[in-house]
C-alpha cells in the first residue's frame, strides 16, 4: 500500500532542494541578471559571454529583439528602437517631453496622460518595454539554471517614487516573474560588499549609472545594514556625459541639422566609444559623419566637470542628513559603469579623503547584491546573518486643522514600517473626515507635497472631540504607502494606496529638504500661530453652542462680559500676534468659568431627576 507524504504547511516536501532565484539590475543603459551558485553570487552571460544586456528593444510588426541586436538597429530605425526607457517609468507624457525634448520617438498620450510610444508593433507604454527587457533576462537565467525562476529581486534607484516602483512591479508581472521584493540599488551594492569584506562602520555608496545618480550613507554593524540617509538625482547619469560629448563633437564637426535621427545616433555612438576609450587613454580619434578629429581627456573632463560637482553636492547633503562628516566614512563603494570615468573617481576620492572601492565590477555589483538577497528571500539560506533596513527619503503625514502638517512617519525612518496616530472631530455632529496625505519636511500644508486625498464617512454624530479616528500609515519593503482611517467605536474604515501619476522633479526633492532647514525657525513660528488660531476657533465654536443652549443661566451683565471677551478673541485671532491670541483665549476661559460651572450643575440635576439618593 502506497503511503501519502504529508509535509508541514508552507514547507517543501523536499527541503534539501534549492529553489531558483535571481537578482536583476534593471538599468537605464544596461541590465544584468545574477544568481547564487555554490555559495557564490555571479552574473549570468549570454551565449557569447557578454554579461551586460543593453536596455534597448527594437520593435517590428512581426516581433521584437532585445539587447545588442536591438541596439545595432538604432541608427537605421530610431523611432522603433526604444532605449533608456527607465527614465520614462512612472512619468507623465508632459514631464517626459519637458525633460527630454530630443527623444526621437513618436509619443501619444493615453487618457490618463501617461506616455504611449507609437511603434511598428503598435502603441506601447514604458511598462511593456521594460517587461520585454525583463523577459530576456529571465530567459537567460532559466536557460543557464535549467529551470524556471521561483522568484526575483529587482533593483530600483533609491529616489524612485511610488509610481515608478509600481511600474517596475507591473513590468515584472507582465514578464511572468514573481517579485520577491524591490531593492534600492545602493543597498544592493552594500549587501555585495558587506558580506564579502565584513567591514563594519559607515559606508557611502556612490551610484552613478546611465540615467540616475544615488548616494546612500549606510552603517554596517554585526550584519545589520541600516541606511542612515539617501540622496541623489533621478535624471543625472552617464547618458548625460554621452550627450554632452555628442553635442561637443557636433559643434566641432559643424553639424547643424538635429532632425536627422541617423546622424543623431551616429554622434551618440561616437561619443560613447570616445568616453570609454578616454578612461584608459589621454587622447582619442573620432570619425563621424565625414569629420575626423581628436578629443582629449582634459576636454572631456571640462565638459562633465559641472555634472560631477552636482553629484558631490548631493553627497554633502546626504552626509549632513546622516549626521556624519566625510572623514567618518570608512569606505566608499563605487557603483555603475559611469564610475569608471577617471575624473569621477578622482573627485570622489578627494571629497571623501580616501580611495574608493572598485574591487567588484561596478557594472555587476548591484546585480550581485540583488542575487544574494533573492537567495535569502526564496528560502535557500537563513537570513539570520543579515538584517536589511531601508529608509523613506521624505516625511509622511496628514493635514490637520489650520493647514498644519502632522508628521506620522519622519524621514529616514527604516522600512517596512507601520505607524498609527489618533485624531478627533472638530465640530459637533461631524459625520465625515477628509484625510489629506502629505509628503515633506515643512510645517504647513502649502509648503509640502500632496500625495492623496480620501474621505472617512459614517462617523457617529457626537460632540466635537467625541469620535476618535485612528489613522495608520504602512510603508512596505518596496516603499509603497497604504493609509487606513478607522473610527474606533464603530469600526467603519476607509483606505487608499498612494500611487502618484508621476514623481517629483529633480529640484523638488533637494529643495524640500533644504527649505526645511532654511525656514526652520520661520516654520515653527508659523505653526505656533496656526495652532493658536485653531484653538481660538475651537473655543469660539464651543462657546457659541453653549450660549445657544443655556443663555438663560446668565444675567445680562454676565452675558455682556462673555460677548465682549469672545469678540476680542475673534478680532485678535485674525492677526499674527501669538501671545495676544493666547491671552484672549485665557480671558474667555476666565469669563466663562462660572457659566461652565452652572451648566455642569444643571446637567447633574437633570441626570438625577426622578432618582433617589439610594439609587445613585
UniProtKB/Swiss-Prot annotation:
Superkingdom in the source lineage: Bacteria
GO BP terms: iron-sulfur cluster assembly
Family: Belongs to the heat shock protein 70 family.
Function: Chaperone involved in the maturation of iron-sulfur cluster-containing proteins. Has a low intrinsic ATPase activity which is markedly stimulated by HscB. Involved in the maturation of IscU.
Claim: ATP-binding is one of the keywords in the record: yes
Disulfide partners: none
Matches recorded under HAMAP family: HscA
Protein name according to UniProt: Chaperone protein HscA
GO molecular function, one term: unfolded protein binding
Gene3D superfamilies on file: 1.20.1270.10, 3.30.420.40, Actin, Chain A, domain 4, Substrate Binding Domain Of DNAk, Chain A, domain 1
InterPro entries: ATPase_NBD, Heat_shock_70_CS, HscA_NBD, HSP70_C_sf, HSP70_peptide-bd_sf, Hsp_70_fam, ISC_FeS_clus_asmbl_HscA
One Pfam entry name: HSP70
SUPFAM superfamilies per the UniProt record, alphabetical: Actin-like ATPase domain, Heat shock protein 70kD (HSP70), C-terminal subdomain, Heat shock protein 70kD (HSP70), peptide-binding domain
Source species: Salmonella newport (strain SL254)
Cell wall biogenesis/degradation is among the record's keywords: no
Keywords: ATP-binding, Chaperone, Nucleotide-binding
Amino acid at each position: 500500500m502506497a503511503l501519502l507524504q504529508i509535509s508541514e504547511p508552507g514547507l517543501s516536501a523536499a527541503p534539501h532542494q534549492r529553489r531558483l532565484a535571481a537578482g536583476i539590475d534593471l538599468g537605464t543603459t544596461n541590465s544584468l541578471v545574477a544568481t547564487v551558485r555554490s555559495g557564490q553570487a555571479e552574473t549570468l552571460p549570454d551565449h557569447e559571454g557578454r554579461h551586460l544586456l543593453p536596455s534597448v528593444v527594437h520593435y517590428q510588426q512581426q516581433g521584437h529583439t532585445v539587447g545588442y541586436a536591438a541596439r545595432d538597429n538604432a541608427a537605421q530605425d530610431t523611432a522603433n528602437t526604444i532605449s533608456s526607457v527607465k527614465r520614462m517609468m512612472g512619468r507623465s507624457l508632459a514631464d517626459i517631453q519637458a525633460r527630454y525634448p530630443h527623444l526621437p520617438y513618436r509619443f501619444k498620450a493615453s487618457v490618463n496622460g501617461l506616455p504611449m510610444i507609437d511603434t511598428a508593433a503598435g502603441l506601447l507604454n514604458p511598462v511593456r518595454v521594460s517587461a520585454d527587457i525583463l523577459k530576456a533576462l529571465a530567459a537567460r537565467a532559466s536557460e543557464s539554471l535549467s529551470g524556471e525562476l521561483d522568484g526575483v529581486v529587482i533593483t530600483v534607484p533609491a529616489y524612485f517614487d511610488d509610481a515608478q516602483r509600481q511600474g517596475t512591479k507591473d513590468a515584472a508581472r507582465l514578464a511572468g516573474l514573481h517579485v520577491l521584493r524591490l531593492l534600492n540599488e545602493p543597498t544592493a551594492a552594500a549587501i555585495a560588499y558587506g558580506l564579502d569584506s565584513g567591514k563594519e562602520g559607515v559606508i557611502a555608496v556612490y551610484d552613478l549609472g546611465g540615467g540616475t545618480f544615488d548616494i546612500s550613507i549606510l552603517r554596517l554593524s554585526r550584519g545589520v545594514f541600516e541606511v542612515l540617509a539617501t540622496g541623489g538625482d533621478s535624471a543625472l547619469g552617464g547618458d548625460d556625459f554621452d550627450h554632452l560629448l555628442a553635442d561637443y563633437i557636433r559643434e566641432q564637426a559643424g553639424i547643424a541639422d538635429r532632425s536627422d535621427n541617423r546622424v543623431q545616433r551616429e554622434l551618440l555612438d561616437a561619443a560613447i566609444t570616445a568616453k570609454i576609450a578616454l578612461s584608459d587613454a589621454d587622447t582619442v580619434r573620432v570619425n563621424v559623419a565625414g569629420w575626423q578629429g581628436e578629443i582629449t581627456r582634459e576636454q572631456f573632463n571640462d565638459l562633465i566637470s559641472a555634472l560631477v560637482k552636482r553629484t558631490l553636492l548631493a553627497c554633502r547633503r546626504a552626509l549632513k542628513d546622516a549626521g556624519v562628516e566625510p572623514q567618518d566614512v570608512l569606505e566608499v563603494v563605487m557603483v555603475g559603469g559611469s564610475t569608471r570615468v577617471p575624473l569621477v573617481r578622482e573627485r570622489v576620492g578627494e571629497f571623501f579623503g580616501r580611495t574608493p572601492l572598485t574591487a567588484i565590477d561596478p557594472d555587476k555589483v548591484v546585480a550581485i547584491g540583488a542575487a544574494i538577497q533573492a537567495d535569502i528571500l526564496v528560502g535557500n539560506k537563513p537570513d539570520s546573518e543579515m538584517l536589511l533596513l531601508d529608509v523613506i527619503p521624505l516625511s509622511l503625514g496628514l493635514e490637520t486643522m489650520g493647514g498644519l502638517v502632522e508628521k506620522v512617519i519622519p524621514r529616514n525612518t527604516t522600512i517596512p514600517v507601520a505607524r498609527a496616530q489618533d485624531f478627533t472631530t472638530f465640530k459637533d455632529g461631524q459625520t465625515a473626515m477628509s484625510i489629506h496625505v502629505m509628503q515633506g519636511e515643512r510645517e504647513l500644508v502649502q509648503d509640502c507635497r500632496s500625495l492623496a486625498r480620501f474621505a472617512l464617512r459614517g462617523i457617529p454624530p457626537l460632540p466635537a472631540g467625541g469620535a476618535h479616528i485612528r489613522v495608520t500609515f504602512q510603508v512596505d519593503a518596496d516603499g509603497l504607502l497604504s493609509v487606513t482611517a478607522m473610527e474606533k467605536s464603530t469600526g467603519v474604515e476607509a483606505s487608499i494606496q498612494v500611487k502618484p501619476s508621476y514623481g517629483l522633479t529633480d529640484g523638488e526633492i533637494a529643495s524640500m529638504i533644504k527649505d526645511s532647514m532654511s525656514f526652520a525657525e520661520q516654520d515653527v513660528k508659523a505653526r505656533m500661530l496656526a495652532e493658536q488660531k485653531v484653538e481660538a476657533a475651537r473655543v469660539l465654536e464651543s462657546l457659541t453652542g453653549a450660549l445657544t443652549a443655556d443663555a438663560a443661566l446668565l444675567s445680562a451683565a454676565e452675558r455682556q462680559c462673555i460677548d465682549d471677551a469672545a469678540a476680542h478673541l475673534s478680532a485678535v485671532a485674525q492677526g499674527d500676534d501669538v501671545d495676544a491670541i493666547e491671552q484672549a483665549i485665557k480671558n474667555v476661559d476666565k469669563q466663562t468659568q462660572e457659566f461652565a460651572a452652572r451648566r455642569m450643575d444643571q446637567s447633574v440635576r437633570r441626570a438625577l431627576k426622578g432618582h433617589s439618593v439610594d439609587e445613585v
